[in-house]
Amino acid sequence: MPGSAREMALLALSACEKQGAWSDGYLKKKIREAGLDRRDAALATRLCFGVLQNKLLLDFYLAQLSRLPLARLEEQVLECLRLGAYQILFLSRVPPSAAVNESVNLARKYAKNPRAAGMVNGILRNLLRQKDAMKTPEDLSIRYSHPQWLVKEFSDTLLDPQQLEALLAADNTQPPTVAQVNTCRAAAGEVLRALEEEGVAVERHPWLKDCLLLAETGSLERLSAFQAGWFYIQDAAARLAVLAAGAEPGMEVLDACAAPGGKSFAAAVAMGDRGRVVSCDIHPHKERLIRAGAERLGLHSITPMTQDGRAFRREWEAAFDLVIADVPCSGLGIIRKKPDIRYKDPAPLAGLPAVQGAILENVSHYVRPGGVLLYATCTLLERENGGVVSGFLEAHPEFSLEGFTLPGPAGDCPGGMVTLWPHLHQTDGFFFAKLRRSR
């Protein structure tokens, strides 16, 4: 069974649990190393993400069938059980015998305890027999596999219990792959036809112009339209932020926390590649990532740089028409894409508003009078969003919120701020505020 989809999922889950690895990046690396075809790569991804999306619920059921507390099991054995249980409970197309037998084989290969395979076999076969009689837990934390602290955070923000449950459920769905068309090189219809010819399931976004929804892509790098720089991957929420900012041809734009470069690309395309977009990140390897993306897209207006958003550059003072500050954040709006983020230690999150405020304070000096400062995050926590903006405005009367209108369900935003929700807008969870400098 070397290089199987289930084995790659197991290795990724174990790396997440033991090493703190991010599932998406680690799994892609293992899939490449194993040379999995498109179908097996999709299965490995579904298994890994499915287990992470439902880990607390899977453990709830497994704990009822195991003679030992789950905490006493070898990590690899527990992951084998979770993989098997996920397939039994959620993947109706997988034959139950395959779900059990492949999990047993993985336990036999990776567990230190020679009896582990037999235990995995027994627990999963018991689950097969009893699954229809098992009740769904009432606790939202267990039912939707969100730690209690996170359920409370979202509850404090949303207040409405029905909205809360809808958000938790949306976090466990698979987001579409969203492609933004590089209209400097191709038209949306041309890109759509090229992708269809390569076997990609593609449709136009229902409300966002020059945007396509992709499925069954396999590796994006293999697609000729990707290689030709006809599109880049970016969720609709991030593109909406750039639309609200109002990038226009000839502008001087600073993207202060730019990696992997999506908003810089969106601004450059909106500007017709005329003007300048200074695209910064604190890490040199991310500057290289932005540069590679800009070169693939043929966007010559983008100048990548390594720069800390908190470090002042005097030559940039009042030099930009538009400054975008998509600051480091808790990332709790992109749980659909990073399901393991919910299990990270929440303690470091307390210090984020101070970092965000420091970046916003610094880059605000780069906005020329009459220019725009766009503050953005991919989180849903008020203290990182409106809280940071309110604190900034109290200290900077020369800035004020400016309303905008967006396509789609968000519509008019007269207050100059908007939070996009996965369960309401079918986008990433995202916040942005548009601030205009008067003097």
Which residue stretches match the model-derived regions?
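S-adenosylmethionine
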Residues: 1-439
